[in-house]
Amino acid sequence: MQKLEVFGAKKLRGQIIISGSKNASLPILAATLLTNKKVYLKNLPKVKDIETMIDLLKSLGSKIKYIKKDLIIDNSKQNKKFASYKLVRTMRAGILVLGPLLSKFGHAKVSLPGGCAIGTRPVDIHLKALSKLGVSYKISQG
């Protein structure tokens, strides 16, 4: 087994600020649809998928604003039940709004996500979970 040994005369001190996790942030952003109260989020990473999810929430009627580096999401007037392909096609995480919309409104329409650079990642696990909860669904074109 290889190892890296570091020799130095000084103790390491200080602080670093790490970015939040994209894969943790995306489901949290989708879950904000479940409440009509304001949600305050800190330390979201500045990556394209997060920006796209924020745009998707806005398209569903969420009011979103930044105060410094914090994000405030207000879904008190969120009333749309359709997640368009234009936004969902660019990230796999778009499917994550399906459950919250279904819970909130009793029905929802979410375009299936587009392709993925790292290969096929079907959404069937989401559909199977919904079926086990008694949800019926239809997949159609357009």
Where would I find each of the regions flagged by the language model?
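Structural preference for solvent-exposed beta-strand-turn elements
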Residues: M1-G142
